[in-house]
Amino acid sequence: MVLPTVLILLLSWAAGLGGQYGNPLNKYIRHYEGLSYNVDSLHQKHQRAKRAVSHEDQFLLLDFHAHGRQFNLRMKRDTSLFSDEFKVETSNKVLDYDTSHIYTGHIYGEEGSFSHGSVVDGRFEGFIQTRGGTFYIEPAERYIKDRILPFHSVIYHEDDINYPHKYGPQGGCADHSVFERMRKYQMTGVEEGTRAHSEEHAASMGPELLRKKRTTLAERNTCQLYIQTDHLFFKYYGTREAVIAQISSHVKAIDTIYQTTDFSGIRNISFMVKRIRINTTSDEKDPTNPFRFPNIGVEKFLELNSEQNHDDYCLAYVFTDRDFDDGVLGLAWVGAPSGSSGGICEKSKLYSDGKKKSLNTGIITVQNYGSHVPPKVSHITFAHEVGHNFGSPHDSGTECTPGESKNLGQKENGNYIMYARATSGDKLNNNKFSLCSIRNISQVLEKKRNNCFVESGQPICGNGMVEQGEECDCGYSDQCKDECCFDANQPEGKKCKLKPGKQCSPSQGPCCTAQCAFKSKSEKCRDDSDCAKEGICNGFTALCPASDPKPNFTDCNRHTQVCINGQCAGSICEKYDLEECTCASSDGKDDKELCHVCCMKKMAPSTCASTGSLQWNKQFNGRTITLQPGSPCNDFRGYCDVFMRCRLVDADGPLARLKKAIFSPQLYENIAEWIVAHWWAVLLMGIALIMLMAGFIKICSVHTPSSNPKLPPPKPLPGTLKRRRPPQPIQQPPRQRPRESYQMGHMRR
């Protein structure tokens, strides 16, 4: 009995030692453990991965033990968060910055795990998602100052984040009165004529245009960001690398949330940083720095960001380390599909205060009531504020606020991202959008994403195309009919992978059966074309092998061209050692020949003639070959229509055609001929016009005033309203009455 008691006491003491005796880091984090792995070794691994040429050296491995488990991180440089034109601006310098210290990976051997962070001076900072929740790693000196510690970093679990009760009236977001003032201001934007007309035209097209947009913009799913940090943010984190690591961590966090959300058929919404502006401590006194003042309210801080022109970006945010009133952690303009300005892709325009502003903006602070909030809190805040930009107001109603429900089952799942007050972040719904938010956001995305969203250039699991890093891709769970492949709704490490024991997937290519096996060598996988033979499966791959080309100079494209090396690329003239030319009317050719394929002898333009001419009868046997509709004709001065007529293109445009129509001599000749032929009709029209004018003068003359006093006065027009002067009251002298009778009369009134 004594031994178990001793063991329990030892385990309790060890647990307290690992968690720094159970002491919280600050009022937000109630439990942590220290990390003391070899920073020199990790720094060397980082330098090796940075210079890596071989595939294996590109991976960064980090192993450590914490919170009663082993972490074996396998990470690789993350380039998906920064655009090809990524720039870092600091103190009037623009740099092509190296982001090789940003990593993304997973825990080796743990399915569905995910990690993201940075390696600066041999220390990893970031977050690790596991089956048991998310862990956060930060430098120890960020929380524990002026002490010698046996560890250099701290790690804590998301469940150990303590959200204080006093979190502002709106839980980190501004109250309703602020949003109401912002909404009224957004309504005062003056739309530029061209953009307003294009938006009205798009709206008039209705659902048909939206369907076309959804098809053509399937890959335009990336919102490019411009992020600035003020001098207070830089002062807290200390270095440029640490600041960029924080930005990367925030963008990756919201990227994970938005990519996994289906916005009414719009999927894989992602984010990419295009430009970063870092205001260092030296910029605190710079008169050109709008954020240099220490005491700025949250609304004014957002306004300073909005006064800059952000037309080149989807969204523009400023990160700061300020303690705003009422515990506000973020503020952003709410987007709308139409009717008001603000949100994603909004362009700079003039507003009621006479200033031009960009309302595709927001702000985030990492300080709340004198303490710095954990990354988990600011990540959720960032996702919440971007949700406003995307068009979602705060959640309301029983459907979208289950945390307020009296049903314990619904209440246990918590509220969604766009809930007005603070969420703990550890409930099932805290990292998801409600149906209300999804409906609002999808409407804004349908209307606005074509204005500024770009193609990500990154592999997308769920788009039906097998790309780098994917074994297969059968789409999402509602689309995937494939028994061989895990759909895109599966967790990381599992989605777009072959199921165990399956040889292939039909999504890989046509040489895989629905039973997940390769087709035999004799099965056809591609029909023959003008210039290539049919494709035949090889029996050991799902891809259809390249087809053998047909012989060169085989006729193709309706006998107007010939095959060259398997491609329909040569002119039919080349088959007979001739060159193709253009029959032009200036050559005296018949207009009917302008849409014929014409050939000439090499280096002899004077021999240019139609394939149906006697000149080339020997080669083409009198067969006339016509150009395809839409082909240029008459020496590129027109195009062939479906009737093989050469339609000339008027380079002067519609105004010139209108001028020609009005002032054409032929027009006046035709009018003169008609008058001669129908002189009687012209005479009748002249008489009718004279009678009409006479009647008009006669009718109106009786109502017209005259200066001749002998004429009767004009008659008023029927229906004319006359203003009657009210009768003047007759003034009577007041009569003297006894006081009593006056009072009684006054009471009777």
UniProtKB/Swiss-Prot annotation:
A motif (SH3-binding) lies at residues 709-716, 723-729. The modification Phosphothreonine is found at residue 720. The precursor is cleaved by furin and PCSK7. One of its GO terms (molecular function) is metallodipeptidase activity. Residues 698-749 are cytoplasmic. Glycans are attached at residues 268, 279, 440, 552. Expressed in brain, kidney, lung, spleen, ovary and testis. This is Disintegrin and metalloproteinase domain-containing protein 10. It comes from Rattus norvegicus. The gene is Adam10.
